[in-house]
Amino acid sequence: MKTMNQIVGENLKKTRELSGFTQEQVAKSIGVERSAYSNYESGVREVPFHLLEKIADLFGCEAFLLFEDNVEADNEILATAFRISD
């Protein structure tokens, strides 16, 4: 069973990659080191909520979607990523 940190991390990575951002770009946008952001994506560290809000704003999605571990959330993440890339 996945931990919440792993679920959030997978969703962060998926959304970032689909949106065309690098880890460095996201980290800079939210004011953390790339290594810290990498730890969030890998599920090693818990993402502070205030940073989740910044990340959700950057990706143009609702923060709660980053906690979802299901197909509906994946579809919403995909839709958000395509809106960003347009």
PLM feature spans:
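DNA major-groove recognition helix of helix-turn-helix/homeodomain DNA-binding modules
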Residues: H50-L65
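The DNA-recognition helices of helix-turn-helix-type DNA-binding domains
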Residues: E33, V44, N70-D74
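Short, charged recognition helix plus adjacent turn
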Residues: F67-D86
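DNA-binding alpha-helical recognition surfaces that contact promoter or target DNA
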Residues: E10, K14, K28, N39, ...
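Nucleotide phosphate-binding site architecture
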Residues: S38, F64, E72
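Short alpha-helical DNA-recognition segment
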Residues: G20-S42, K54
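Residue-level signal for the short linker/turn that defines the boundary of a DNA-recognition helix
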Residues: E10, G20-F21, V47-H50
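A short, Lys/Arg-rich alpha-helix, primarily the initiator
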Residues: M1-L18
